[in-house]
């Protein structure tokens, strides 16, 4: 995790920011096309991309898959409240949830509950099984609340990167 006090992004120049914006739009863009879009020749552009990778600004490249084609069309968010009386309950929960492939995201949050999970499953029957056989049995789980998504209005992984 990056120390937020250091704010490494403040040292990026306009070209670095443009490179990151273009790669967010299309991670498969060729270096030649990327260099044209950001106003560099190919070699310095590739050197900048490699530097951004080394420095951790670019963590990897991935394909965006259509969940409806892959038997994962039901999107569910789950609030988890832990039994805070148990020792090391947060660490145990964190370790256990890391092993669950069905959980796409797990966030420790402030508020009336402890964690917000995002999961995708084929249907409600599969979710009921996941909840009853897995989530409720995770270390320290005291309570859950389920929110089934009826419609995905907006979905994006893009970060806002100001080009100044």
Swiss-Prot record:
GO terms under cellular component: cytosol
Keyword Transcription applies: yes
InterPro entries cross-referenced by the UniProt entry: ArsR-like_HTH, AsnC-type_HTH_dom, Dimeric_a/b-barrel, Tscrpt_reg_AsnC-like, Tscrpt_reg_AsnC/Lrp_C, Tscrpt_reg_HTH_AsnC-type_CS, WH-like_DNA-bd_sf, WH_DNA-bd_sf
Example GO biological process: regulation of DNA-templated transcription
GO molecular function list: sequence-specific DNA binding
PROSITE patterns: HTH_ASNC_1, HTH_ASNC_2
Domain HTH asnC-type span(s) in chain numbering: 12-73
Keywords: Activator, DNA-binding, Transcription, Transcription regulation
Record-annotated DNA-binding residue ranges: 31-50
Purpose of the protein: Mediates a global response to leucine. Exogenous leucine affects the expression of a number of different operons; lrp mediates this effect for at least some of these operons. For example it is regulator of the branched-chain amino acid transport genes.
Subunit structure: Homodimer.
Protein name in UniProt: Leucine-responsive regulatory protein
Organism of derivation: Salmonella typhimurium (strain LT2 / SGSC1412 / ATCC 700720)
Gene designation per UniProt: lrp
């Amino acid at each position: 995790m990056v120390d937020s006090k250091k704010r490494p992004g403040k040292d990026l120049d306009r070209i670095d920011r443009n490179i990151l914006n273009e790669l967010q739009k299309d991670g498969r863009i060729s270096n030649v096309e990327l260099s044209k879009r950001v106003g560099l020749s190919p070699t310095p552009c590739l050197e900048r991309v490699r530097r951004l990778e080394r420095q951790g600004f670019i963590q990897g490249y991935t394909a965006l898959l259509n969940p409806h084609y892959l038997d994962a069309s039901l999107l569910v968010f789950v609030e988890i409240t832990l039994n805070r009386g148990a020792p090391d309950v947060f660490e145990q929960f964190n370790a256990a949830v890391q092993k669950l492939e069905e959980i796409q995201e797990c966030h420790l949050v402030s508020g009336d509950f402890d964690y917000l999970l995002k999961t995708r499953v084929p249907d409600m029957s599969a979710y009921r099984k996941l909840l009853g056989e897995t989530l409720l049995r995770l270390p320290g789980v005291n309570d859950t609340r389920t929110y089934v998504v009826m419609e995905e209005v907006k979905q994006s992984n893009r970060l806002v990167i100001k080009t100044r």
